[in-house]
Amino acid sequence: MSLHQFLLEPITCHAWNRDRTQIALSPNNHEVHIYKKNGGQWVKAHELKEHNGHITGIDWAPKSDRIVTCGADRNAYVWSQKDGVWKPTLVILRINRAATFVKWSPLENKFAVGSGARLISVCYFESENDWWVSKHIKKPIRSTVLSLDWHPNNVLLAAGSCDFKCRVFSAYIKEVDEKPASTPWGSKMPFGQLMSEFGGSGTGGWVHGVSFSASGSRLAWVSHDSTVSVADASKSVQVSTLKTEFLPLLSVSFVSENSVVAAGHDCCPMLFNYDDRGCLTFVSKLDIPKQSIQRNMSAMERFRNMDKRATTEDRNTALETLHQNSITQVSIYEVDKQDCRKFCTTGIDGAMTIWDFKTLESSIQGLRIM
């Protein structure tokens, strides 16, 4: 495991470039900072300043090397690098509330933006007019959209929202997409078609994170009632929900076809297993607890605590986990969702951690990624 303390401020969101030599993150304000790996150090290389509201989402397209950002100013920008300088292009989202989340499609020819306007803007480039335009998916969303993930076929889109529901929509755009083949989620896919809807019948909570598996036939989501759920379209959309004893999870990702990693307010990642019988189980916390050591506080730590915790007391308030506050995002760091070797987390403590499954398997007894 490698932990890097980027900031004293929270990291709102992050995205990696293709070869993982650069990371784009937002320090809980209207800017995006791009850090470059230089030996063992991370050095700030660029600052992207165009938004005038808090940035809420960043995604970095690996093949085309474009960054898309969205924010509370109701705007999205596509950033392209020319001669070492990042240039923004405004995207017309046509929303009257903050944008909350953004995600490139697998083919990078469109992206989706969730918002507080109870809709999803699916944006694509119109070459004859030389600008990015959007189409809206509105019905039957009844509240803020918090999370999105694309199906590998570049057409289906999963969305989690504050109306306690997780939904799968068709985001087929005839201008840029080829006619999609039939999937276990359905065969008719006109734009905006609701393919599946889960949750919200009197129970549940805000859906903070969603993730398709590498095959696209499974969908995982985490809700504010501390549940993890997986729907399997290959088993006639069978849903398995696990009520955990932890604080709510905020982000989720498949790391193999049968394994899911989620993290949130408990400050450490958790591993869950979904077997071929459709049974969802909790496997382990993926953190190696540090032994607390009683020691005198240095002057440096005293000043740091004044800054971070508004206290100069020397009582040890450090958590036993690597992250010292809620984890807000989980992303794949090495390989992909089919066979993840390493994953990355960022959190409210301003830290970024890269987790290595090989190291975790050797230090946590009985742990194996299925």
Curated annotation (Swiss-Prot):
GO (cellular component) term, any one: glutamatergic synapse
PROSITE patterns recorded: WD_REPEATS_2 (PS50082), WD_REPEATS_REGION (PS50294)
The entry's keywords: Actin-binding, Cytoplasm, Cytoskeleton, Nucleus, Repeat, WD repeat
One example of a Gene Ontology biological process annotation: Arp2/3 complex-mediated actin nucleation
SMART domains per UniProt: WD40
InterPro entries, per database record: ARPC1, WD40/YVTN_repeat-like_dom_sf, WD40_repeat_dom_sf, WD40_rpt
One Pfam match: WD40
WD repeat extents: 6-45, 50-89, 140-179, 202-241, 244-284, 322-365
Compartments (UniProt record): Cytoplasm, Cytoskeleton; Nucleus
Single GO term (MF): actin filament binding
Alphabetized SUPFAM superfamilies for the sequence: WD40 repeat-like
Keyword 4Fe-4S carried by entry: no
Keyword Glycoprotein: no
Top-level taxon of the source organism: Eukaryota
Function: Probably functions as a component of the Arp2/3 complex which is involved in regulation of actin polymerization and together with an activating nucleation-promoting factor (NPF) mediates the formation of branched actin networks. In addition to its role in the cytoplasmic cytoskeleton, the Arp2/3 complex also promotes actin polymerization in the nucleus, thereby regulating gene transcription and repair of damaged DNA.
Subunit-structure text: Probable component of the Arp2/3 complex in which it may replace ARPC1B.
Family that this chain belongs to: Belongs to the WD repeat ARPC1 family.
Name of this chain's protein: Actin-related protein 2/3 complex subunit 1A
Lineage, uppermost ranks: Eukaryota, Metazoa, Chordata, Craniata, Vertebrata
